[in-house]
């Protein structure tokens, strides 16, 4: 649990269907070496010793399954002193996050509370990286994202994907990961504005892009290659190889 008086609340997105992974069940519940991606992501949050509450966003049809699974694993009922609960997510990621934010009792949270938004599919995220994001918000940032340099050349293409428009300077590009950290009051305000606008002009692909749209400065911290998103069968093969060879060391770190 966070030792500071400012509460840190994590929203763990687990409502997606995961169609690109190709399995019969939602991606968060796919098993990686006898533990689901959701369990692994939840354990990383607990091991980081940075959060006071974790809200897991699940689709309504998976709530009972998720509750039974987490109860069996001892991950409900305040494991390690951290409150863990389930909330129904929405049809799109932005809808799920908004549902999670609305589930936070603002009466219990101080105006400067911190919220983390994390993808359960980033199941091997090191706890130290989670702590790094939280620390940066504690230091005064409104919005924080973990990033990595890109190794591939990136092309911007025409809407039909057939013609290259230009080549951005790779030195200025970063791959963005989660968890992303925010001041709770600012992220709530950005979501209120977005969902109240019948034509916001864009679809947020992550919460940082919503904060950019809202006008907030988004600060970068160092990401970690282990925080990759398990999206395709190849990603799952990589995750299996890593856990086969390095399972005992994956969750060793709280700090950095």
Curated annotation (Swiss-Prot):
EC number in record: 2.7.7.60
Biological pathway: Isoprenoid biosynthesis; isopentenyl diphosphate biosynthesis via DXP pathway; isopentenyl diphosphate from 1-deoxy-D-xylulose 5-phosphate: step 2/6
Enzyme class: transferase
Protein's GO biological process: isopentenyl diphosphate biosynthetic process, methylerythritol 4-phosphate pathway
Coiled coil start-end: none
PROSITE patterns in the cross-refs: ISPD
InterPro entries for this protein: IspD, IspD/TarI, IspD/TarI_cytidylyltransf_bact, ISPD_synthase_CS, Nucleotide-diphossugar_trans
Keywords (A to Z) from UniProt: Isoprene biosynthesis, Nucleotidyltransferase, Transferase
Catalyzed reactions: 2-C-methyl-D-erythritol 4-phosphate + CTP + H(+) = 4-CDP-2-C-methyl-D-erythritol + diphosphate
GO terms, molecular function: 2-C-methyl-D-erythritol 4-phosphate cytidylyltransferase activity
Site feature: Positions MEP for the nucleophilic attack: 170, 229
Pfam families: IspD
Highest taxon above the source species: Bacteria
Function text: Catalyzes the formation of 4-diphosphocytidyl-2-C-methyl-D-erythritol from CTP and 2-C-methyl-D-erythritol 4-phosphate (MEP).
Name the record gives this protein: 2-C-methyl-D-erythritol 4-phosphate cytidylyltransferase
Annotated organism of origin: Corynebacterium glutamicum (strain ATCC 13032 / DSM 20300 / JCM 1318 / BCRC 11384 / CCUG 27702 / LMG 3730 / NBRC 12168 / NCIMB 10025 / NRRL B-2784 / 534)
Record gene name: ispD
């Amino acid at each position: 649990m966070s030792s500071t008086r400012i509460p840190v609340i994590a929203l763990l997105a687990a409502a997606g269907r995961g169609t690109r992974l190709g399995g019969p069940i939602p991606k968060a519940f796919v098993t990686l070496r006898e533990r689901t991606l959701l369990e692994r992501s939840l354990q990383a949050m607990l091991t980081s010793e940075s959060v006071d509450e974790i809200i897991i966003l699940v689709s309504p049809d998976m709530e009972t399954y998720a509750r039974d699974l987490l109860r069996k694993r001892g991950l409900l009922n305040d494991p390690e002193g951290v409150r863990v609960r389930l909330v129904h997510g929405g049809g799109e990621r932005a809808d799920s996050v908004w549902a999670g934010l609305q589930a936070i009792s603002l009466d219990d949270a101080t105006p400067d509370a911190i919220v983390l938004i994390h993808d359960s599919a980033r199941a091997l995220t090191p706890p130290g990286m989670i702590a790094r994001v939280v620390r940066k918000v504690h230091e005064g940032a409104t919005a924080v994202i973990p990033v990595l340099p890109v190794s591939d050349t990136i092309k911007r293409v025409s809407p039909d994907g057939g013609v290259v428009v230009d080549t951005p300077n790779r030195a200025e590009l970063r791959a963005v990961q989660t968890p992303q950290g925010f001041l709770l009051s600012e992220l709530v305000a950005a979501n209120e504005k977005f969902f109240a606008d019948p034509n916001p002009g864009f679809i947020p692909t992550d919460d940082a892009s919503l904060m950019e749209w809202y006008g907030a400065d988004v600060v970068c911290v160092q990401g970690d290659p282990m925080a990759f998103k398990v999206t395709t069968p190849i990603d799952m093969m990589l995750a299996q190889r890593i856990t086969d060879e390095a399972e005992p060391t994956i969750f060793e770190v709280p700090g950095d």
